[in-house]
């Protein structure tokens, strides 16, 4: 899985970038999404607040914002078109590969790690996996959706080795 990571805060260590890369690759493997691409941007609470207002019409910072990529253009090509034009086939596969972007608030991650009594590493892993599941179509609006998403989230974090302790 290709993951573009940007640290707008200047506060994310190389080790944390590496952990985020590894846990997202691990989650992608669990979901069969190894051939996908995504972006992760680490932001401050101030930037998170701006993004939350812009994308979710919510006037406060949040821990992770997940923007699932859904191409606006519905372009239909038949198999013959793609066989005759390899560049077109390659371009279409690139559109299919990109699944979305996460914005993770470093400030919120620190606050929540302290609040929940676990490590910053665990909180960052949790936020990355939580956001990753959102951009792959998981949600928690209903009790059934919540049970499915949170169960998978915990399964991934535990299998990776990021437990609550």
Curated annotation (Swiss-Prot):
> What top-level class of enzyme does the UniProt entry assign?
hydrolase
Gene Ontology CC, one term: cytoplasm
Query: Cofactor note, please?
Result: Binds 1 zinc ion.
- A GO BP entry: rRNA processing
PROSITE patterns named among the record's database cross-references: UPF0054
| Localization | Cytoplasm
Q: Which InterPro entries match?
A: MetalPrtase_cat_dom_sf_prd, YbeY, YbeY_CS
Q: Where does Zn(2+) bind?
A: 130, 134, 140
Q: What keywords does the record list, in alphabetical order?
A: Cytoplasm, Endonuclease, Hydrolase, Metal-binding, Nuclease, Ribosome biogenesis, rRNA processing, Zinc
The EC number(s) attached to this protein equal 3.1.-.-
Indicate where this protein is primarily found. Answer: cytoplasm
Q: Which cofactor does it need?
A: Zn(2+)
Gene Ontology molecular function terms on file? metalloendopeptidase activity; RNA endonuclease activity; zinc ion binding
Which HAMAP family does this chain map to?
Endoribonucl_YbeY (MF_00009)
State what this protein does. Answer: Single strand-specific metallo-endoribonuclease involved in late-stage 70S ribosome quality control and in maturation of the 3' terminus of the 16S rRNA.
Q: Which family does it belong to?
A: Belongs to the endoribonuclease YbeY family.
Q: Extract the NCBIfam families matched here.
A: rRNA maturation RNase YbeY (TIGR00043)
Full protein name:
Endoribonuclease YbeY
Q: Which organism is it from?
A: Streptococcus pneumoniae serotype 2 (strain D39 / NCTC 7466)
């Amino acid at each position: 899985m290709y993951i573009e990571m940007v640290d707008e805060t200047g506060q994310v260590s190389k080790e944390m970038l590496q952990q985020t890369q590894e846990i997202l690759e691990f989650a992608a493997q669990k979901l069969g999404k190894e051939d996908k691409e995504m972006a992760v941007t680490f932001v401050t609470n101030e930037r998170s607040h701006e993004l939350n207002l812009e994308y979710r019409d919510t006037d406060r910072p949040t821990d992770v914002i997940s923007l699932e990529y859904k191409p606006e253009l519905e372009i239909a090509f038949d198999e013959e078109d793609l066989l005759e034009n390899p560049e077109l086939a390659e371009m279409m596969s690139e559109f299919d590969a990109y699944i979305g972007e996460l914005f993770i608030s470093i400030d919120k991650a620190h606050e929540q790690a302290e609040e929940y009594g676990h490590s910053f590493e665990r909180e960052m892993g949790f936020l990355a996996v939580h956001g990753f599941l959102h951009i792959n179509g998981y949600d928690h609006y209903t009790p059934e959706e919540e049970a499915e998403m949170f169960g998978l989230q915990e399964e991934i974090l535990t299998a990776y080795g990021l437990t609550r302790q």
